[in-house]
Swiss-Prot record:
This is Putative CTD phosphatase-like protein 355R. It comes from the Viruses. Residues 1-180 form the FCP1 homology domain. PANTHER family: DULLARD PROTEIN PHOSPHATASE. One of its GO terms (molecular function) is phosphoprotein phosphatase activity. May function as a phosphatase. Its EC number is 3.1.3.-.
């Protein structure tokens, strides 16, 4: 089975710090269109449209992993609330955080690559990963540029944008992944 790494911020979810809210009415109206969670009155985090069906598809067809530039505590909250709590049978095999992004940038200085998948098999010698079976889904162009053949790009998701509740990006990506699997 192939491996897929998922980015969190602006790929699967969008988080807005409460301290940045200037129009509380609009903020609440926008959030009402989404599955959202309040993280300790610090962040309001909204799941991207079609997140759960997309995750169902991924967990059925891939070994699922996370690679995020977020801190461990923040990422753990998102993983628990948006991924695992919705379906306790889901299993995430490996989670990489901000620390791993810093290591990647240090190792791949010339490319400034914060999530270089190659590290898994060349530096860390993890035998279940290789360039033929390991991919990442991310919204950052830098991630795509550093591994063109192993990255599936998505448009960044921002729930405060008008019409963001109609976002179809995860369903589009599901079709792309389906073609890639076959």
């Amino acid at each position: 089975m192939k491996n897929i790494f998922l980015d969190l911020d602006n790929t699967l979810i969008c988080a807005e710090p409460f301290e940045d809210i200037t129009d509380l009415g609009r903020f609440k109206e926008r959030a009402s269109h989404f599955d959202f969670k309040n993280m300790e009155d610090y962040y309001l985090i909204c799941g991207r449209p079609y997140l759960q069906p997309f995750l169902d598809y991924l967990f059925k067809n891939f070994n699922v992993h996370i690679w995020t530039a977020a801190s461990k505590g923040y990422a753990s909250f998102i993983i628990e609330e948006f991924i695992l709590k919705k379906d306790p049978s889901r299993k995430i095999n490996l989670v990489l955080f901000d620390h791993h992004c810093r290591v990647s940038k240090r190792v791949y200085k010339k490319e400034k690559a914060s999530k270089k998948l190659e590290m898994l098999w060349t530096i860390w010698k993890l035998q279940e990963f290789d360039k033929e079976n390991t991919f990442i889904i991310d919204d950052l162009e830098e991630v795509k540029e550093s591994q063109v053949k192993n990255c599936f790009s998505v448009k960044p998701f921002f729930f405060m944008e008008n019409d963001s509740e109609y976002d179809q990006e995860l369903m589009r990506l599901k079709d792309v992944l389906n073609r890639h699997l076959n």
